[in-house]
Structure formats: structure tokens, C-alpha cells
Amino acid sequence: MAAADAGLPERAQALAERAVRLVEEPRSIARLAELRARIAFERGSVHTAHDILLSGADRVAELDPAAAGLMLVDAGRNAWQLSDPRRVEEAAARLRRLRLRPEDGLDAAVDAVEAAAVSLNAGPAGALPAMRPLARDARGIERGSYGLRINGAFVAGLVGEFETQRQISVALVEECRTLGMTGLLPIAYVTLAGAELYLGRFRSAAADAAEGLRIATDTGQPHRTGYLEGILAWIAAVEGDEDRCAGLAVRCADHFAATGIANGLAWSEWALAALDLSLGRHTRALDRLEAALAGPVRHQIQAVYFAPDQIEAAVRAGLPDRAKEPLERLAEWADVARLDWADAVLARCRALLEPDDEIFSAALRPHGRPLERARAELGYGEWLRRERRRRDARPHLRAALETFQRLGAGPWARRAAAELRAAGEATAAPAASDRLAALSPQELQIVRLAVTGLTNREIGARLFVSPKTVSHHLYRAFPKLGVSSRVELARLGPDLDPDAAT
């Protein structure tokens, strides 16, 4: 286990294969099965991982139901990532047959596996009530229990509780860094970067995804690589970096072809469509999302989260009839989710189809997702301008432009600026004071740690790079930030939160 945690999969696998012939004690059998399955999954052998977990659970089910339950929960999560209803149902059925006790602490996790089966067969809305408790339970675990906390972070993302997902993930990343658990860092960065993305913390998401990608590549975890590249493709789309988005999307498709895991593919298909939408290629965006829904992506939560893009693409392409199904999909989920952001986004989508001051006002209620709020401001401002209410339109268009600029959402900022000019207001160039935008993802990671007072050696230990590499990146970052020493860097204080303004 220590070799796997330290990011040494080859050594861990060799030791596990040797141990499998020697171990007889039930708990040791369970831990060994978990380890072998984890190595197989991280290296892309997903079906092998599933079979190892089921076999291991069978061997210890009578003697240690809790250990068997943990393995079956992992098997269910892995099968969900394959968009494989049969395998999820198999894990759920075996969980039902175990003699689990309340004190085993697995009730919420078992319910989540049951809910995953419901989600794959009947859609994600019906799974929400059963999934929420796992996310909230995981937030209360302070240390250890890595499997439950990782599952909890994933589930928090599935139920739209992105701040909970971020809190769990931040704690996991910090703990893994401190304990040198390199092998677990990529999955922790997957959940952290995903949460930051949904919350509009794009610079942090890019930096954390890039760091997770570096470690996943170094430790031979192709599944994590594909997932993180999908997140980076989505961020590239928002920034308007067409070449980078397309290149990362190709890599995600290759990972899917090799492993069958749909997470990265779901992100990359959404990324390509989001790029098309932001650049005004509305019919192309709509066609792309509809095509994605014909494959395994339809079982992923992104099918709910990209429904607003599908609706907007249909409306802007002059094809409102094709917005009906995604609107129903989003409304069904939002009605059960009862989240402020989901209600606001649903209102925005309805306002695009039937513009109205009252509906747009509902779309503008605060909810913690700045990109979605800015898109509502833009949509409202566009409609007001078309209605010849230019004075009313300008504050909304101005607010949209300022948010898009802060987020680095170039194509959206250009659209908002054009609308604002059409509404009779000149627009200024983006502020030159955003010093963090010039930093590379690794420079940003290092600067964020340096400002806390950590030495180069301590930063290197956290990020698994040499002190010399840390020094090199700080040397490159200082002039970009307008400082020449660590003392001046520390004075910047809160200004070094890359997403504080969002």
C-alpha cells in the first residue's frame, strides 16, 4: 500500500502479486484486493479492477462484511465511470446481500451506489436524495478514510454541491502532500479542479489540474490523465484557446478508446461545444452536444450540466424546438436538487426561450457561479437592447463584461463588449493590473505556497519538485508580479488569490 500511495505503481504491483500467494487473513485479503484493484484502475485496466474487487469482496463477505462493503462501493463507483449500468447494479445487489451494521459507517455509501444504478437507468434526478448524505458525511471526516472521502467528493459534484466538493478535496490534497502520498494526489486533484471549475475559479482549476496531470503522468495513471485533460480542455474553451482545446479533446478521445472510461470524454465533448457556442457557432455546438448524448456521455452528470449550453445553442441558432428536451432534462434535475445556482440557471434558460423581466430577475439571484451569472447578465442586456431599452441594458452588459474579463473568458468578454458598444457605451480595454494572468499554472502553484512563508525546500516537498525548480519558477514569476523579493511578494497578500475577484 505504501508503494502505491508513494506513486510507485510498478513496485506496488510486483509486491501485490507476490503477496497474493501468501495472504490468508481476511482483512489482509481485503486490503490486498483493494490495492490490486486500485493499481489496475489507475493504469487503465478498469474491467480487471472491477473483477478484482468483486472477487475480493466475495472472499471476505462472511468474515468481514464492512471490508467487503468498501470494496463493493469502489466497484460501483468505477462502474459508474464506465457508464455501465449492469456492473453498477451488480455491485449494488451484492451490497444488499451483505450483513452490514449501522456502526460500519457505510449506509450512505451503499445508498449512493444504489442511486448510481438509478441514475444510469432512469436519469440523475431520481438519484439525488440518496446521494447527498454521502457527500455531507465525507465532509465531516477529518483524516484518513481516503476511499470514503474521495467517493464523497465525487458524489458532491454529482449532486451540484460544489463548495462541499471543494472543501473535501482541499483537505485531501493537503493531507496527501503532507504525508507524501503521491499516488493519491491525481484523484484528489481531479475532484478539486472540477469543483473549482464549477465555482468559476478557473485559474486555480487550471493550476491544480496541471499539477495533477503532471503527477498522473509521472506515476502512470492514464485514467486520471484523461480526466484532467478533459477539465483543461474545458478551461481552454472558456478562454477561447481553440488549438489547445482541440488538442486536449483528441487526447481525451484516445484515453476513452483505450480505457472505456467516459469522464474525460464527457468533459472534452462539452468543451468543444462550449467553444463553438462562445464563438457564435451555434448550430455546430448544438449538433455536437446532441451527438454526445447518443453515446456513453448521456450517463454522465455533464449531460445535466451542459443542458444550458444546449438550450442556448438551440435558441441562438433559431431552432427553439430542439431546446425542449434539454430544458426538460435540466428542469427535472433542478426541481429535485433545490440549489440556488440550479434554479437561477434554469430561469436563464427559460428567459432565453420566453424573455421577460421577471424571469431574468430570477436568473440574476446570487448563487456562487460567476460565469453562469454573467451569462444571465449578458442575455438580459441583449434582450433589453433589442427592446430599445438601451439605458436599462447597459448596467447588465457592463456587469457581464467585467465578470468575463476577471474570469479570463475571452470570447464571452468580446461578445459582451460588442453588445455594450451597441447599447451606446464605450468599453475600456481589459485591466492591465491582473498580474496573475501572466503566470503559468506551476508558477501560480509555487507563488501561492511561497506567500504563506514556506521555504523553497518545503514548497518542493509539497509539489514533489526540487528546490532548484522552485527557485527557477519564482525567478520567472517575480517580474510578472512586479516584485523582486519574497518580502515584496508577501505584501501582495490577498491579491495573490487568483480567483478572489470572482
PLM region spans:
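Residue register within tetratricopeptide repeats
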Residues: 10, 47, 86, 125, ...
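Linker/hinge segments immediately adjacent to helix-turn-helix/homeobox DNA-binding domains
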Residues: 352, 356, 390-442, 457, ...
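Internal alpha-solenoid helical repeat scaffolds
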Residues: 1-227, 235
